Regions:
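An extracytoplasmic/periplasmic, membrane-proximal ligand-sensing/linker region
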Residues: 295-340
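A bilobed periplasmic-binding-protein/Venus flytrap-type ligand-binding module shared by bacterial periplasmic
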Residues: 139-144, 183, 256-269, 288
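Periplasmic-binding protein-like
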Residues: 162-170, 279-302
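Short amphipathic alpha-helical coupling segments at ligand-binding clamshell hinges
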Residues: 51, 61, 190-194, 259, ...
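Early extracytoplasmic/lumenal segment of secretory-pathway proteins
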Residues: 31-98, 340
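Bacterial N-terminal signal peptides
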Residues: 11-26
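Extracytoplasmic ligand-binding site segments that recognize negatively charged/polar headgroups
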Residues: 42-46, 68, 72, 84-220, ...
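A ligand-binding cleft/hinge motif common to bilobed small-molecule-binding domains
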Residues: 95-99, 221-242
């Protein structure tokens, strides 16, 4: 009888021990560490931060955001190689993504993500997506110049008559993309002549917002910028004196460019990284971005609700992000003409 009781007690004790062990192994202390993604963000800081916060709120996946310039971060990814901590790269322009994709640093995006966007705004090999779009414009001050007196083509700003009347940002990725568009449309010589004329007769600024404020304050009559800077300044100051002019007839002055993103091939969390990329292309993710910056959503069927000129009314040149390549030729020309 005593032996039977001893065996029963031993069996109960073993069962209790296994139960406790099972509970311990499923407790938070023994659970797998939660995933944290690293986003290399070349877009504007507020855009990347808001996107990361919204994605974490939806999925529970934390996103560590590292901010830098698009070109700087692309170079860092190439230097880091397989050791890169980056999971997703989000650039303000497409050339850095084009460059990384061509050199094999990006993983192919999920088909469902690619199919949510127009094919002309994703990489041909599927390694990156265009997230949102913006258009090049001329911001002008009506107190200094009438809209009807603006040139018919952005190329005309290189003429002597515009001396001291046009501002631009030679270090801007979008300006460099515009130079590539001129190369594609008119040839290298025309692009070099344009850059040479701007250097001789235009005013250079350190960044686009500084340039735009120069127009707003009457320091210069016109500047070449992206449309969303004007809306950002309007949000900050209220009604503005300056206005936007949109080039037509496929002129390079109305070039459409895109912010872009891709999953890093060396990502330690490829599944979750693809989730973040898909979120950027989703309706919710696109609204988070376009509510932060006045850009056009790229998701099929979506339209801007920020009072922008309708996307379908833009008369942009037929130049795709893929056509812009890595913008190296434009950088060479800027160096040759003394702009960089």
């Amino acid at each position: 009888m005593m032996l039977r009781n001893t065996r029963l007690a031993t069996s109960l004790l073993r069962g209790l021990t296994l139960s406790i062990l099972g509970l311990a192994l499923t407790s938070p202390a023994y659970a797998a560490d939660p995933v944290t993604l690293t986003l290399y963000n070349g877009q504007h800081k507020e855009v990347g931060d808001n996107l990361a916060a919204a994605f974490e709120a939806k999925t529970g996946i934390h996103v560590n955001v590292r901010k830098g310039s698009s070109n700087q971060l692309a170079s860092q990814i190439m230097e880091e190689g397989d050791r890169s901590p980056a999971d997703v790269f989000y650039a303000e322009e497409s050339p850095p993504l084009n460059n990384l994709g061509e050199q094999g640093f990006l993983a192919k995006a999920d088909d469902s993500t690619l199919q949510a966007l127009p094919k002309e705004y994703v990489a041909a090999n599927g390694t990156w997506i265009g997230v949102t779009a913006r258009t090049r414009v001329v911001a002008f001050n009506p107190k200094l110049i009438k809209e009807e007196d603006l040139p018919k083509s952005v190329l005309d700003f290189a003429d002597p008559e515009w001396q001291g009347k046009v501002g631009f940002v030679p270090t801007s990725g979008a300006f460099q993309e515009q130079a590539v568009a001129i190369i594609k449309l008119h040839g290298r010589d025309a692009a070099e002549e344009w850059l040479t004329g701007l250097r001789a007769f235009g005013k250079t600024y350190t960044n686009n917002m500084v340039a735009l404020k120069a127009v707003e304050n009457g320091e210069v009559a016109t500047v070449l910028v992206n449309n969303y800077y004007w809306f950002a300044l309007e949000k900050e100051k209220g009604k503005l004196d300056s206005k936007l002019h949109y080039f037509t007839d496929g002129d390079a002055g109305g070039l459409i460019t895109v912010s872009s993103a891709g999953v890093i091939k060396a990502s330690k969390h490829p599944k979750e990284a693809q989730q973040l990329l898909a979120y950027m292309a989703s309706e919710e993710g696109q609204r988070v971005i376009t509510n932060t910056t006045a850009e056009y959503p790229m998701r099929k069927g979506m339209v801007s609700d920020r009072g922008l000129k309708p996307f379908e009314e833009l008369q942009a040149p037929k130049i795709t992000p893929a056509d812009l390549g890595n913008a190296e030729e434009a950088l060479e020309l800027e160096r040759d003409t003394g702009l960089l």
